[in-house]
Amino acid sequence: MPVKLRILGADDHVELEQVRQFFRNYAAWLGVDLDYQNFGEEMASLPGAYAAPAGRLFFAVFEGRPACCVGIRPSSDGVCEMKRLYVEPDMRGNGIGRQLALAAIKAAKALGYRKVMMDTLPAMRIAVKLYRELGFKEAPAYYPTPVEGTLFLALDLENWSESEVKNENLFHLFDYNLAWARRMRQVDPGYFEKLSTLQA
């Protein structure tokens, strides 16, 4: 079943309440007190800075269930910020986060932004890997943060194309298959020999 994406506005009360829950889940998942980012005010005012015309708040449904959210909001002249990419734990592994991040990047480009900025934590290894595959590169801090080790990333939209991302994604699939193969050998060292026998 395909992922259904929506851009939320102020009248989407039910979906906005679900996004608020996603935001709370996101904060708990990070394990970081986000008060320094005015997190409570951000949730209460949704869509807030993520609203059109300069921002976008994406909401995804997968297999009939709310699954994911992400937002882009203006930061400075020609620059926007991608924030709050969150996928429900039992929905991960289906490529939903990648689809939503791509939707946000393409929206930013269509809105005329030259650059997308974002921050994350090195411990979020899968997310960091995704961002690098999408073309993000390490950048100087664009705001002060009390969270030690915060990783700041930037994406140059003027030199970005989705086709290059798709090519890079082949490496993502290789890494996934390699990890799966290693895991199967741990579970059953003779797994691939048995599989070869069945296919013979």
Language model feature labels by segment:
Residues 88-94, 122-123:
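Active-site acidic-Proline motif in GNAT/NAT acetyltransferases
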Residues 107, 111, 180:
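Short alpha-helical functional segments enriched in proximate histidine and acidic residues
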